[in-house]
């Protein structure tokens, strides 16, 4: 609805209706700063120009209630009709509220951790960013697919295969069993460097498609992925497809990429094949002397396939991949292909210190999830509920705490995850939003028990607090559209916190169930509309909207 309000304001401004000068404002529902731009050209004060524009405006929109000129700003205020239509649209559209009719096929590649052990807490920041972006794009109307790109041809995988051959797999969660084999194999290689030749032979045999070697690699990778999928499922993340990089060697795409680069005279051959990129210090190796390709070569092939099949493709990568991302994009441009849009994210630490990932010393995502679940259970265990219900709520609160804390920080900022803060019901957390949703559900349940009348929202009954809340509710589709454009999922987390906080202010200041009948119907409509926005919003963040807490 707010998107419609923006359209009406642009139309009302006529020749001055340039969207880039419109701002959300604390002092108005929407403000134009066009007068500040025109002041330089016309050699008048912004106030004079804004006064003139407002004086000559002919507003015909039923959604614009009033317009004011204040110190150079042109302030627009929504009408009662706009407020009424907002609440009615939310209640009518219900689960569909927030949906946009945008079209197109989008591919989002995220997580894509090496299959040599369990995910750590940095990996799940990647997963949560990618999954949230995918959910929001789907809400916007796009046909979205998510991929996990499996690095099954890398050196780490060959070391894992060697480790499984030498030490076997222990009876534990599959990805953790694979990690132990990988760690032991690394120790073995350090004390027996002559085994490096065996690793190289494994890599070459796998790339050449040797049947027995392929079987060993597939077993190792599938075992790791089995455990990784279990972890992702606990935080409500699933991928549409796991795409193995070896597919692009087998299906000819790697050969196609190398062939085009060779044909265009872009590769140097000195045993190995390399490419020199303008603006980069070092040449990029595409093929080793023994004929095996590198990760970037196979990734180029994957992105050639993406170009052929998708209009828009987005990768989520750690900040340590910035150089790699720039090299990949540059070579794709040389191939005449579109590079991916990349969301880079910074690393995650715990209050006790940063993660360490080599000799078995890392904080796995499984450990983190288990810890947060235990703490959520401690908080909820004293509640007067059935045991099973408490367990389900504790799990939902734990997953919500992790997902929300990981998404509320802008991807480019380093974050520290503190479970005690993430589980605080009074802070800016998922549990605070879940509790707000449960509060709205509780109010509506009590209203039904009391014989809830037909809801009827009336704009003219709105107090300032009610008006503020309804205007916020109108912005959900607008925020969805912003994220599609800006790829900043933290903006949606901020929006939902604002809705929850404003709703709780409304509830504190406005009796609902004890209000007189007309006001009661009006306020119950606001509560129900808020419930819809909080529920739909939590689902976009991959968090369960609890009805009881």
From Swiss-Prot:
Catalytic activity as recorded in UniProt: tRNA(Arg) + L-arginine + ATP = L-arginyl-tRNA(Arg) + AMP + diphosphate
GO molecular function terms attached to this record: arginine-tRNA ligase activity; ATP binding
SUPFAM superfamilies: Anticodon-binding domain of a subclass of class I aminoacyl-tRNA synthetases, Arginyl-tRNA synthetase (ArgRS), N-terminal 'additional' domain, Nucleotidylyl transferase
Xref: SMART domains: Arg_tRNA_synt_N, DALR_1
Motif 'HIGH' region boundaries: 113-123
Coiled-coil residues: none
Record keywords: Aminoacyl-tRNA synthetase, ATP-binding, Cytoplasm, Ligase, Nucleotide-binding, Protein biosynthesis
Gene Ontology CC terms, in alphabetical order: cytoplasm
Localization per record: Cytoplasm
Signal peptide: none
Superkingdom to which the source organism belongs: Archaea
InterPro entries, alphabetized: Arg-tRNA-ligase, Arg-tRNA-synth_N, Arg-tRNA-synth_N_sf, ArgRS_core, DALR_anticod-bd, Rossmann-like_a/b/a_fold, tRNAsynth_Ia_anticodon-bd
NCBIfam families with a match to the protein in the record: argS
Family under the similarity heading: Belongs to the class-I aminoacyl-tRNA synthetase family.
Name under which the protein is recorded: Arginine--tRNA ligase
Gene that this sequence comes from: argS
């Amino acid at each position: 609805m707010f998107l419609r309000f923006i359209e009406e304001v642009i139309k009302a401004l006529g020749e001055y209706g340039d969207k880039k000068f419109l701002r959300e404002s604390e002092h108005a529902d929407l403000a134009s700063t066009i007068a500040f731009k025109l002041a330089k050209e016309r050699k008048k004060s912004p106030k004079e120009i804004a006064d003139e524009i407002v004086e000559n405006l002919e507003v015909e929109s039923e959604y614009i209630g009033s317009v004011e000129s204040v110190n150079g700003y042109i302030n627009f205020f929504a009408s009662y009709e706009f407020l009424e239509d907002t609440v009615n649209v939310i209640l009518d559209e219900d689960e569909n509220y927030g949906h946009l009719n945008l079209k197109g096929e989008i591919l989002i590649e995220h997580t894509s951790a090496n299959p040599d052990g369990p995910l750590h807490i940095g990996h799940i920041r990647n997963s949560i960013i990618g999954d949230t972006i995918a959910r929001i794009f789907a809400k916007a109307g796009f046909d979205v697919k998510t991929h996990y790109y499996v690095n099954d041809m890398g050196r780490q995988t060959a070391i894992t295969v060697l480790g499984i051959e030498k030490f076997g797999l222990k009876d534990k969660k599959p990805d953790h069993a694979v990690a132990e084999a990988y760690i032991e194999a690394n120790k073995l290689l350090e004390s027996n460097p002559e085994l490096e030749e065996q690793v190289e032979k494994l890599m070459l045999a796998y790339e050449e498609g040797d049947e027995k070697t392929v079987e060993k690699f597939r077993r190792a990778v599938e075992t790791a992925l089995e455990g990784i999928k279990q972890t992702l499922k606990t935080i409500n993340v699933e991928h549409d497809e796991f795409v193995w990089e070896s597919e692009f060697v087998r299906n000819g795409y790697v050969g196609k990429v190398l062939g085009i680069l060779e044909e265009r005279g872009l590769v140097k051959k000195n045993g190995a094949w390399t490419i020199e990129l303008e603006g980069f210090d070092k040449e990029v190796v595409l093929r080793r002397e023994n004929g095996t390709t590198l990760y970037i070569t196979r990734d180029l092939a994957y992105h050639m396939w993406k170009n052929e099949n998708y209009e828009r493709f987005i990768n989520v990568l750690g900040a340590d991949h910035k150089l790699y991302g720039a090299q990949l994009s540059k070579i794709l441009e040389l191939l005449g292909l579109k590079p991916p849009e990349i969301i880079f994210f910074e690393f995650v630490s715990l209050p006790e210190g940063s993660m360490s990932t080599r000799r078995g010393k890392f904080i796995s995502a499984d450990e983190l999830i288990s810890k947060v679940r235990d703490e959520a259970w401690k908080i909820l265990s004293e509640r007067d509920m059935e045991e099973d219900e408490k367990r389900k709520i504790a799990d939902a609160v734990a997953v919500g705490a992790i997902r929300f804390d990981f998404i509320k920080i802008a991807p480019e900022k380093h974050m520290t995850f503190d479970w005690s803060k993430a589980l605080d019901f009074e802070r800016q957390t998922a549990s605070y939003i879940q509790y707000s949703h449960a509060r709205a559900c509780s109010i509506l349940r009590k209203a039904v028990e009391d014989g809830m009348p037909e809801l009827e929202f009336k704009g003219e009954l709105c107090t300032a607090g009610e008006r503020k809340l309804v205007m916020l509710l109108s912005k959900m589709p607008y925020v969805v559209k912003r994220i599609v454009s800006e790829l900043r999922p933290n903006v949606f987390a901020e929006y939902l916190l604002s809705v929850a906080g404003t709703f709780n202010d409304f509830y504190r200041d406005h009796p609902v169930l004890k209000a007189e009948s007309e006001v009661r119907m009006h306020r119950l409509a606001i509560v129900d509309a808020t419930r819809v926005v909080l529920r739909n919003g939590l689902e976009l963040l991959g968090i369960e909207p609890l009805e009881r807490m």
